[in-house]
């Protein structure tokens, strides 16, 4: 996917001050309910969940359900499983078309974290803000829908329905469903000591989109202008937008090639939160230790300048449509990282070895002084495409 021209509201006969991100008070997957609260809310659902003999069932047909990002439900016939996920987010960028693509990629990401590369069907969930004027609604929402549809087509699937409602905030999401044979998905519970942790997108998207909005807010911009330039912010924002819109499908396919043992995608709970959740699911007594944090260029400095506001260095900063965190055999990890960069998969794919799996008690942690890997923007080398339907 090529880089796009910056969204210009006036090209769509909108006021130049129009910002999609103003139609929600939370950003992206920053809408997540805190993990501890979520677990308590789900307790009543889990009480009577899967009363069958789990050991027998697991040996015959793997199953995942409440508390996980994706459900894997054995079907009654044919040795197949239903694999399904749902997700929604709030606007995190101001380009409606790209926001649609990001929303779709975010929904699909939970399938990809299971190593599933084919999606049979998608539904779109759309909340149209009642604060949008008729003109804004009629110009902006079709762009969002088109972006969602285009991303679904890139993923080899289609949108066949959904639900659209009025809402105070713009809400974007969907449901992704597929039917799989057991060899088409990878259960996220087989990490072993000696594995390494690989991450397939840099961190810092939430920081990049936040500071991009600060360009219009002098009192906030003044806090960080000594550590970052306007050009740095613009590049980080564009890079974040392209990363969020990029599907994790290539990484999902390579999980099979290089014998991945477990994976999750990095979204609203941050790198550490999702690593902890994945560690809890492991069959073996292991723990994850993260040594390296790949971060969008200059965003680590911005985060430090803001104190603990973002939580980036502590692993708690939310990501939207982030990369996959994959447990790979040590001897396979470097080959995975090299292969994902191959031009045959298109531009923009990267991966980093960020930590290890060791014997432990199913926890995850970041070392006291992790190495920050500054990830330079790649967009300068890519073509720029205009927004669909814009008038010159």
Curated annotation (Swiss-Prot):
Binds 1 Mg(2+) ion per monomer. GO terms for molecular function: ATP binding; metal ion binding; protein heterodimerization activity; protein homodimerization activity; selenide, water dikinase activity. It is found in: Cell membrane; Nucleus membrane. The record marks 32 as: Important for catalytic activity. It is an enzyme of class 2 (transferase). Its cofactor is Mg(2+). GO terms for biological process: selenocysteine biosynthetic process. It is a peripheral membrane protein. Its main location: membrane. The active site is at residue 31. Its EC number is 2.7.9.3. The keyword Protease does not apply. CDD domains: SelD (cd02195). Synthesizes selenophosphate from selenide and ATP. Belongs to the selenophosphate synthase 1 family. Class II subfamily. This is Selenide, water dikinase 1. It comes from Xenopus laevis. The lineage of its organism: Eukaryota, Metazoa, Chordata, Craniata, Vertebrata.
């Amino acid at each position: 996917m090529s880089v796009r021209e910056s969204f210009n509201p006036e090209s769509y006969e909108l006021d130049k001050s129009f910002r999609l991100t103003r139609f929600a008070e939370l950003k992206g997957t920053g809408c997540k309910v805190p993990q501890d609260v979520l677990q308590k809310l789900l307790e009543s659902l889990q009480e009577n969940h899967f009363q069958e003999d789990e050991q027998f069932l697991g040996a015959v047909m793997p199953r995942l359900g409440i508390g996980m990002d994706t459900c894997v439900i054995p079907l009654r016939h044919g040795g197949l499983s239903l694999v399904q996920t749902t997700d929604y987010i709030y606007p995190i960028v101001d380009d409606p078309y790209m926001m649609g693509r990001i929303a779709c990629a975010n929904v699909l990401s939970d399938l990809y974290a299971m190593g599933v590369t084919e999606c049979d069907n998608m539904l779109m969930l759309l909340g149209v803000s009642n604060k949008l004027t008729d003109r804004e609604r009629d110009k902006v929402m079709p762009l969002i829908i088109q972006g969602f549809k285009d991303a679904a087509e890139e993923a080899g699937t289609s949108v066949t329905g959904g639900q659209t409602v009025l809402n105070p905030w713009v809400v974007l999401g969907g449901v992704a469903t597929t039917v799989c044979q057991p060899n088409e998905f990878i259960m996220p519970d087989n990490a072993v000591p000696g594995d390494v942790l690989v991450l397939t997108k840099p961190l810092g998207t939430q920081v990049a989109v936040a500071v991009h909005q600060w360009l219009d807010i002098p009192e906030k911009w003044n806090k960080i202008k000594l550590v970052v330039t306007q050009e740095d912010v613009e590049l980080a924002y564009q890079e974040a937008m392209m990363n969020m819109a990029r599907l994790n499908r290539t990484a999902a396919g390579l999980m099979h090639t290089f014998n991945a043992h477990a994976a999750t995608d990095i979204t609203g709970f941050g790198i550490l939160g999702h690593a902890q959740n994945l560690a809890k699911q492991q069959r073996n007594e292991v723990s994850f230790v993260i040594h390296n944090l790949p971060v969008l260029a200059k965003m680590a400095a911005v985060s430090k300048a803001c104190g603990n506001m973002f939580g980036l260095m502590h692993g708690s900063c939310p990501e939207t449509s982030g990369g996959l965190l994959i447990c790979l055999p040590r001897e396979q990890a470097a080959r995975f990282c090299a292969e994902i960069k191959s031009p045959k998969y298109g531009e923009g794919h990267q991966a980093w070895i960020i930590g290890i799996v060791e014997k432990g008690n199913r926890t995850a942690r970041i070392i006291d002084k992790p190495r920050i890997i500054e990830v330079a923007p790649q967009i300068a080398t890519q073509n720029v495409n205009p927004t669909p339907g814009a008038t010159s």
